[in-house]
Amino acid sequence: MNKPSLPKQFALDIGHTPKPSLNNFLAGENLALHSALLALVKSWELNTPREANENALNQRWIYWWGPEGSGRTHLLSAIGDAAQELGLEHFPLTPNEPISWVRLEEKITTLCASDTPSVITVDDVDRLDERLVAALFRILNAIQGSKAVHIFMAGNAAPG
Protein backbone atom coordinates (compact mmCIF):
# COMPACT_ATOMS: atom_id res chain seq x y z
CA MET A 1 0.00 0.00 0.00
CA ASN A 2 1.30 3.40 -0.96
CA LYS A 3 1.22 6.10 1.65
CA PRO A 4 1.10 9.66 0.48
CA SER A 5 4.50 11.27 0.95
CA LEU A 6 4.81 14.04 3.44
CA PRO A 7 6.13 17.38 2.30
CA LYS A 8 9.82 17.93 2.90
CA GLN A 9 10.39 19.73 6.16
CA PHE A 10 13.02 22.44 6.41
CA ALA A 11 15.04 23.05 9.53
CA LEU A 12 14.35 26.28 11.33
CA ASP A 13 17.72 28.00 11.62
CA ILE A 14 17.24 29.77 14.94
CA GLY A 15 20.88 29.41 15.92
CA HIS A 16 22.18 31.60 13.10
CA THR A 17 23.49 34.96 14.28
CA PRO A 18 23.75 37.45 11.43
CA LYS A 19 27.03 39.28 10.93
CA PRO A 20 26.86 42.70 12.64
CA SER A 21 26.18 45.48 10.17
CA LEU A 22 24.87 49.01 10.22
CA ASN A 23 21.84 47.78 8.29
CA ASN A 24 20.78 45.22 10.89
CA PHE A 25 21.40 47.42 13.94
CA LEU A 26 18.22 48.45 15.74
CA ALA A 27 19.03 52.09 16.46
CA GLY A 28 16.34 52.84 19.04
CA GLU A 29 17.66 55.72 21.16
CA ASN A 30 20.96 55.62 19.25
CA LEU A 31 19.53 57.08 16.05
CA ALA A 32 21.93 60.05 15.94
CA LEU A 33 24.97 57.80 16.32
CA HIS A 34 23.63 55.29 13.81
CA SER A 35 22.90 58.06 11.28
CA ALA A 36 26.38 59.56 11.75
CA LEU A 37 28.02 56.17 11.15
CA LEU A 38 25.90 55.53 8.05
CA ALA A 39 26.82 58.96 6.66
CA LEU A 40 30.49 58.34 7.37
CA VAL A 41 30.47 54.99 5.56
CA LYS A 42 28.68 56.67 2.65
CA SER A 43 31.47 59.28 2.47
CA TRP A 44 34.02 56.44 2.35
CA GLU A 45 32.04 54.78 -0.45
CA LEU A 46 31.96 58.00 -2.44
CA ASN A 47 35.55 58.83 -1.48
CA THR A 48 34.47 62.28 -0.32
CA PRO A 49 35.95 63.67 2.87
CA ARG A 50 33.60 65.03 5.50
CA GLU A 51 33.40 68.80 5.72
CA ALA A 52 35.89 70.17 8.24
CA ASN A 53 33.29 72.50 9.73
CA GLU A 54 30.96 69.61 10.68
CA ASN A 55 32.82 69.26 13.97
CA ALA A 56 36.29 69.82 15.34
CA LEU A 57 37.47 66.25 14.80
CA ASN A 58 35.68 65.87 11.47
CA GLN A 59 33.78 62.84 12.84
CA ARG A 60 37.01 60.90 13.06
CA TRP A 61 36.86 60.30 16.83
CA ILE A 62 33.63 58.91 18.20
CA TYR A 63 33.06 57.33 21.61
CA TRP A 64 29.80 55.71 22.66
CA TRP A 65 28.74 53.95 25.82
CA GLY A 66 25.99 51.83 27.23
CA PRO A 67 25.33 48.79 29.37
CA GLU A 68 26.03 45.20 28.35
CA GLY A 69 23.78 44.25 25.43
CA SER A 70 23.21 47.82 24.23
CA GLY A 71 24.88 47.23 20.85
CA ARG A 72 28.30 48.78 21.48
CA THR A 73 30.25 45.81 20.14
CA HIS A 74 27.75 45.33 17.29
CA LEU A 75 28.37 48.88 16.06
CA LEU A 76 32.15 48.60 16.41
CA SER A 77 32.13 45.36 14.42
CA ALA A 78 29.78 46.86 11.85
CA ILE A 79 31.88 49.97 11.23
CA GLY A 80 35.06 47.88 11.04
CA ASP A 81 33.48 45.41 8.63
CA ALA A 82 32.09 48.25 6.50
CA ALA A 83 35.59 49.73 6.25
CA GLN A 84 37.11 46.38 5.27
CA GLU A 85 34.42 45.77 2.64
CA LEU A 86 35.48 49.07 1.07
CA GLY A 87 39.13 48.00 1.08
CA LEU A 88 40.13 50.20 4.01
CA GLU A 89 42.45 49.03 6.77
CA HIS A 90 40.75 48.16 10.05
CA PHE A 91 42.52 47.69 13.37
CA PRO A 92 40.25 46.14 16.02
CA LEU A 93 41.65 46.66 19.52
CA THR A 94 40.40 44.99 22.70
CA PRO A 95 41.81 44.60 26.21
CA ASN A 96 42.31 40.86 25.56
CA GLU A 97 44.66 41.23 22.57
CA PRO A 98 47.63 43.45 23.50
CA ILE A 99 49.64 42.30 20.45
CA SER A 100 47.14 44.07 18.16
CA TRP A 101 47.99 47.33 19.95
CA VAL A 102 51.70 46.79 19.30
CA ARG A 103 51.04 46.08 15.61
CA LEU A 104 49.01 49.26 15.27
CA GLU A 105 51.63 51.40 17.00
CA GLU A 106 54.22 50.05 14.55
CA LYS A 107 52.07 51.25 11.60
CA ILE A 108 50.61 54.45 13.06
CA THR A 109 53.10 56.87 11.45
CA THR A 110 52.42 55.45 7.98
CA LEU A 111 48.64 55.53 8.55
CA CYS A 112 48.74 59.15 9.67
CA ALA A 113 50.70 60.20 6.58
CA SER A 114 48.19 58.57 4.22
CA ASP A 115 45.16 60.26 2.66
CA THR A 116 43.38 56.90 2.47
CA PRO A 117 40.94 56.43 5.34
CA SER A 118 41.71 53.77 7.91
CA VAL A 119 39.69 52.66 10.92
CA ILE A 120 40.61 51.81 14.49
CA THR A 121 37.97 50.32 16.78
CA VAL A 122 38.51 50.04 20.53
CA ASP A 123 36.04 47.92 22.47
CA ASP A 124 35.63 47.83 26.25
CA VAL A 125 37.62 51.02 26.87
CA ASP A 126 36.61 50.79 30.53
CA ARG A 127 38.53 47.49 30.84
CA LEU A 128 41.89 48.76 29.56
CA ASP A 129 44.79 48.32 31.97
CA GLU A 130 47.36 51.09 32.58
CA ARG A 131 49.60 49.87 29.78
CA LEU A 132 46.79 49.89 27.20
CA VAL A 133 45.47 53.26 28.41
CA ALA A 134 48.97 54.64 27.77
CA ALA A 135 48.97 53.01 24.31
CA LEU A 136 45.55 54.53 23.54
CA PHE A 137 46.82 57.94 24.62
CA ARG A 138 49.84 57.60 22.28
CA ILE A 139 47.56 56.50 19.42
CA LEU A 140 45.17 59.42 19.97
CA ASN A 141 48.06 61.88 20.04
CA ALA A 142 49.52 60.39 16.86
CA ILE A 143 46.27 60.52 14.87
CA GLN A 144 45.16 63.95 16.03
CA GLY A 145 46.80 65.65 13.06
CA SER A 146 45.73 62.99 10.56
CA LYS A 147 42.96 63.71 8.10
CA ALA A 148 42.10 60.10 7.36
CA VAL A 149 42.48 57.94 10.47
CA HIS A 150 39.14 57.29 12.20
CA ILE A 151 38.90 55.91 15.72
CA PHE A 152 35.71 54.52 17.23
CA MET A 153 35.67 53.61 20.91
CA ALA A 154 33.05 52.10 23.18
CA GLY A 155 32.72 51.41 26.86
CA ASN A 156 30.13 50.94 29.56
CA ALA A 157 30.25 54.49 30.95
CA ALA A 158 30.38 58.05 29.71
CA PRO A 159 33.83 59.63 29.71
CA GLY A 160 34.47 61.34 32.97
Sequence positions of predicted segments:
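Short, glycine/polar-rich helix-capping loops at beta-to-alpha or helix-loop-helix junctions
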Residues: 160
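Conserved helical "switch/dimer-interface" subregion of ABC/ABC-like ATPase nucleotide-binding domains
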Residues: 82, 138-142
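A short, basic N-terminal segment
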Residues: 1-51
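Short glycine-rich substrate-engagement loop in P-loop NTPases that contacts/grips substrate
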Residues: 75-76, 80-117, 128-130
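Conserved P-loop NTPase "ATPase switch" module shared by AAA+ and STAND
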Residues: 93-95, 110-135, 139, 150-157
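Conserved RecA-like P-loop NTPase ATPase core
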Residues: 25, 33, 64, 76, ...
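Walker A/P-loop nucleotide-binding motif
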Residues: 49, 53-76
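Short loop/turn elements that form and flank the Walker-type P-loop nucleotide-binding site
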Residues: 57-58, 86, 113-116, 145-148
